[in-house]
Amino acid sequence: LAWLGIMPIDGEFRGVLQGEFGNSYGSVVKPVMEVIKEPMKTTVWINILATVLALGITIPLGIFCAVKKGSKRDTLIQVGSIIGYSLPTFIIAILFIFLFAILLPVFPVSGMNTPGSPYTGIMSILDRLYYMCLPLIVMTFCSLGGMTRFVRASMIEALSMDCIRTARAKGLKERTVIYSHAWRNALIPIVTLVIGWFLGIFSGSVMIEQMFEINGMGRVYIQALTSN
């Protein structure tokens, strides 16, 4: 650990398992938990929203592509998914900033709420959601490509199972076969993927948080790396 440069200054890890991470020796000496508490809340909040939005889009889209496998619409969605998956996050962010903040000035591009706003309660929540719209759109879009293809692959595998052929042979409606039988079998690997995503929530979205000036864990990482 000392060779990696991550050894604490006092050389001890006592208290880590109890959430006592010691002090942060930045411009001002503060307890680590005090430094990361608010950024952690922001990062978890925005990542959970982005995950929910992405799942709400990719699950029906992946099922549709699996059912319509080989069709023109499936091919079109797959091409779009590959393009979206291949583009770097900052390129997608720049494109959306140009589209929704410059060409069509709909959303703000930085901050988390209106500076000096007197909002409280529900208005404060709505104001923050308004400022989070563009980062959420970018994060959701960045997730669509990989997740859509994953759901599609899981559904195609489920639809080829013997139990699905048996269900169709019994004369069940196609909708029942897809959603009551195939989807249940395809759900297991998808749940595994989602759990992995939630574990990655705490790492923060470094690039997006930096570009949109969001006070999250991503910015904390950058500040820690660039501090003397």
Go through each PLM region and give its residues.
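Alpha-helical transmembrane segments of integral membrane proteins
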Residues: 40-44, 49-73, 89, 116-228
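Short helix-coil transition/hinge motifs at the ends and kinks of transmembrane helices
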Residues: 11-20, 25, 108-125
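Hydrophobic alpha-helical segments of integral membrane proteins
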Residues: 1-8, 21, 32, 36, ...
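Glycine-rich, flexible loop/turn motifs
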Residues: 17, 21, 103, 108, ...
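An internal, D/E-rich "acidic patch" concept
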Residues: 1-59
